[in-house]
Amino acid sequence: MCYTVFLETNRGAKYMKLTHKHTLAASYLGYITQAVVNNLTPLLFVVFETSLGISIGRISLLITVNFGVQMLVDLLSAKWINVIGTRRAIVAAHAFAAAGLVALGVLPYRTADPYVGVLCAVCLCAVGGGITEVLISPIVEALPSEDKAGSMSLLHAFYCWGHVGVVVLSTLYFALAGTGRWALLPVLWAVLPLCNMVLFARVPLCKLAGDEHHTPLRALLKSKMIWLFLLMMVCA
């Protein structure tokens, strides 16, 4: 099924059909958004120390908070995503990501302690990143395709390309504008999740076969393998 979006132009009314190809493109952009929220803040660690006077110890805590919030969201999302629906959840994920990026550029200069502003922004980004991590792969897996394995491989490659893009484009921004204007950078990056949020609100989504059956959270917490994987990620 395709969704039809009505577009009003100066030359008259036109219709654009959104198909599963647009859903796949939105998913690829979703993983680029994931790369932005995970990798932009570490690029600013030196700026946080020199411009905001935040100590290295407090900066390193941001990494732990980001990881912890994302893991918590991953655990809780299995239950409440079924309640609000996939579309609302993925739209909310991009809204959190955009809000976190904007907050990263604004809140440090609006709070008594700049660290509090940065911490709030990191938490918002982590919520968006956690939901995105849970949903994007199932969304792509549910799409009708003759090459699901290829689509999934390409999907995860987009995170790597997004990481490279964040580093290269952010470095180019600093070279042209200087680190003194760092606060504008995350606001500019927020355009990506905002645009993709609108796209996900309109593209067709498919229901994954058998997605009504889920392992209860309590059963997951009792699994020794789950705790082993968590320990490995923390150590990494």
Give the label of every model feature segment.
Residues 22-48, 52-54, 137:
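Extracytoplasmic
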Residues 95-112:
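C-terminal ends and interior cores of transmembrane alpha-helices
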Residues 146-147, 154-205:
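Helix-loop-helix hairpin linking two adjacent transmembrane segments in secondary transporters
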Residues 121-157:
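Cytoplasmic helix-loop-helix junction between adjacent transmembrane helices
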Residues 67-68, 160-161, 233:
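Short hydrophobic/small-residue motifs within alpha-helical transmembrane segments
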